């Protein structure tokens, strides 16, 4: 008799290792916001015996976390919990830091904000052609505003008002929620079991991810293989999964896609999303004809994080660390930005003399150890394993954008621009019909820079950071991958890099459907492929939603419910307009014209 299913074994491994990997901030600290109480072993419950899985889970929680038995109110069923707040160690590290969003209208505003950020050594979280998010200490706000023009002094809103608390809440909780928002969906649209979903109910540390990947490959050896891309600066393997079914006597070049996340260590949602898509494809092979067809026609390389050293560092030391952990010319400034160190149009001369910058690309092309390892690996696969890389998808956060080449300059256009845009718009539509989340479509330079609009006929692009040396541009231009994209995942800034764990599965649904759309596009117009029931392969959390591939759907008229995380309009949540700590002389009515600030699809290419 089999005691556990495949999913339960994977979940058991993930859960036990996750609990042991949670940072021990304080002996008196507790996880934030438990959605539903967990019945512990030490609590007497005569009404029903606990199953083996439940007892094992609860005993791990009680032993490792030291959670006391839950007490019930007399005559009621409500549970009491000890207070939970960010421990002193987090508050010591992050102090009273906040995250502000500045809305932009002119190139002069961008220039002033860039200069002020460099002077004050501020952490720029994200930037688009409409806004810039900056992390800084509250007591630095007056200094920053004093360096800015009057037009920017009253047009900022706080996104995160208590950074230490928000960071604390991003770590795994030992309380398992039964909320429907945290349940995963298999490609059939049916909710998967709670045991299977334990892995995706929380973000996972590398010490959990690697054994989980190995176990997944061992359970599905016919179409999944655990591999190492190379070694990191600190000697860790760069883990990956190769997923696909290649005919025994097939000598043709094997078309291969790379799905990569975690270049920037603090972007945890990218890591979890790579794992989610890999798991969904692996476990659906043989059950879904479209998915089986994709795995028979392509190899998928899933790399949860190309930056294992940095990712571990975000769990053990600094949740907001971005770069890798290699040494630089300055002993007190570690790390290279692994998305600014690639060889094509590397412009390290912009940051080459300052290793302390977040976007430091190294002192030469491919100075980043892990980027060099991946570049050498794909070359070796092409030369020795007869692989033909046809697509590259680089997952980042945040801002909900689908970006295509080029990143280094808006003055250059890719030769197959029409096809890149067509596919990007199809991916955006698939995402929107999954969870009604709108992703903007743009060239990478347009998504990473701010432009002066309505002032001159030709747009002037200003860089918030170095944009050369990107993986996107190298794979497309130097390595010849015809379809290369960077997806910036949820959200639009309410939480930024600290996206709550409730978003793991919905984001996974969205990117899974994006990958399905990409695969369908790459298969071409062969009748045998087009006649497949592709909608049966897509993940649809709400069965009443429109089919993903309904060609009659009107993108412009479809209801868009994607307004729940607009940080600058949220009066109650983390983006509330609380400006009590902003000097009075910098407060204003914030009544600027925002008529052109919509979130619809934006096609920014220059003709």
Swiss-Prot record:
It comes from the Eukaryota. Disulfide bonds join 333-356. Keywords: Cell wall biogenesis/degradation, Disulfide bond, Glycoprotein, Metal-binding, Secreted, Signal, Vacuole, Zinc. It comes from Ajellomyces capsulatus (strain NAm1 / WU24). Substrate binds at residues 264-267, 322, 339-340, 397-398. Residues 539-607 are annotated as: Disordered. Residues 1-21 form the signal peptide. The keyword Disulfide bond applies. Inactive carboxypeptidase that may play a role in cell wall organization and biogenesis. Glycans are attached at residue 349. Zn(2+) binds at residues 264, 267, 396. GO terms for cellular component: extracellular region; vacuole. PANTHER family: INACTIVE METALLOCARBOXYPEPTIDASE ECM14, PROTEASE FAMILY M14 CARBOXYPEPTIDASE A,B. Coiled coil: none annotated. Residues 22-174 form a propeptide. Binds 1 zinc ion per subunit. Its cofactor is Zn(2+). GO terms for biological process: cell wall organization; proteolysis. This is Inactive metallocarboxypeptidase ECM14. The keyword Mitochondrion does not apply. Residues 573-590 have a biased composition (Basic and acidic residues). PROSITE patterns: PEPTIDASE_M14.
């Amino acid at each position: 008799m089999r005691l556990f299913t495949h999913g339960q074994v994977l979940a058991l491994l993930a859960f036990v290792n996750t609990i042991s990997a949670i940072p021990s901030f304080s002996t008196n600290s507790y996880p934030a916001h438990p959605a539903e109480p967990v019945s512990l072993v030490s609590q007497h419950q005569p009404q029903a015996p606990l199953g083996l899985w439940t007892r094992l889970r609860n005993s791990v929680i009680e032993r490792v976390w030291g959670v006391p038995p839950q007490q019930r109110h007399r005559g009621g069923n409500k549970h009491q919990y000890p207070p939970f707040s960010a421990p002193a160690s987090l508050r010591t590290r992050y102090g009273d830091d906040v995250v502000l969003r500045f809305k932009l209208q002119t190139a002069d505003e961008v220039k002033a904000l860039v200069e002020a950020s460099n002077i004050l050594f501020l952490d720029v979280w994200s930037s688009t052609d409409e806004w810039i998010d900056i992390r800084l200490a509250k007591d630095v706000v007056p200094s920053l505003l004093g360096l800015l023009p009057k037009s920017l002094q009253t047009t900022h809103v706080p996104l995160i008002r208590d950074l230490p608390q928000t960071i604390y809440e991003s770590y795994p909780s030992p309380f398992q929620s039964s909320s429907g928002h945290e349940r995963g969906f298999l490609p059939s649209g049916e909710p998967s079991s709670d045991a299977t979903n334990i892995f995706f109910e929380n973000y996972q540390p590398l010490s959990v991810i690697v054994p989980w990947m190995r176990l997944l490959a061992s359970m599905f050896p016919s179409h999944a293989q655990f591999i190492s891309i190379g070694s990191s600066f600190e000697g860790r393997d760069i883990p990956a999964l190769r997923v696909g079914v290649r005919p025994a006597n097939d000598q043709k070049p094997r078309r291969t896609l790379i799905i990569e996340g975690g270049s920037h260590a603090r972007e945890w949602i990218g890591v979890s999303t790579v794992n989610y898509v890999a798991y969904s494809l692996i476990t659906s092979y043989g059950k879904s004809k479209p998915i089986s067809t994709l795995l028979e026609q392509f190899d998928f390389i899933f790399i949860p994080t190309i930056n294992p050293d940095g990712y571990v560092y975000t769990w053990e030391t600094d949740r907001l660390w971005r770069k890798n952990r290699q040494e630089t010319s300055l002993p007190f400034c570690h790390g290279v930005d692994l998305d600014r160190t690639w060889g094509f149009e590397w412009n390290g001369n912009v940051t080459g003399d300052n290793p302390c910058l977040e976007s430091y690309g190294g002192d030469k092309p491919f100075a980043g150890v892990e980027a060099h390892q991946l570049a050498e690996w794909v070359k070796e696969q092409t030369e020795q394993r007869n692989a033909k890389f046809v697509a590259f998808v680089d997952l980042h956060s945040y801002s909900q954008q689908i970006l295509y080449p080029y990143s280094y300059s808006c003055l250059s256009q890719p030769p197959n621009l029409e096809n890149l845009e067509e596919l990007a718009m199809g991916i955006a539509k698939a995402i929107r019909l999954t969870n009604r989340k709108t992703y903007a479509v743009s060239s990478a330079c347009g998504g990473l820079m701010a432009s002066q609009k309505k002032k001159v006929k030709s747009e002037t692009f200003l860089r918030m950071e170095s944009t050369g040396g990107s993986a996107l541009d190298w794979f497309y231009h130097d390595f010849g991958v015809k379809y290369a994209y960077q997806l910036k995942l949820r959200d639009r800034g309410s939480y930024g890099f600290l996206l709550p764990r409730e978003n793991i599965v919905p984001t996974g649904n969205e990117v899974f459907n994006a990958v399905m759309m990409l695969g369908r596009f790459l298969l071409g117009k062969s009748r045998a492929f087009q006649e497949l029931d592709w909608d049966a392969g897509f993940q649809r959390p709400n069965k009443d939603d429109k089919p993903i591939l309904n060609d009659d759907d009107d993108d412009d008229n479809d209801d868009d419910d994607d307004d729940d995380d607009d940080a600058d309009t949220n009066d109650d949540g983390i983006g509330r307009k609380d400006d009590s700590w902003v000097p009075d002389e910098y407060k204003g009515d914030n009544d600027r014209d925002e008529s052109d600030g919509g979130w619809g699809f934006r096609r920014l290419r220059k003709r």
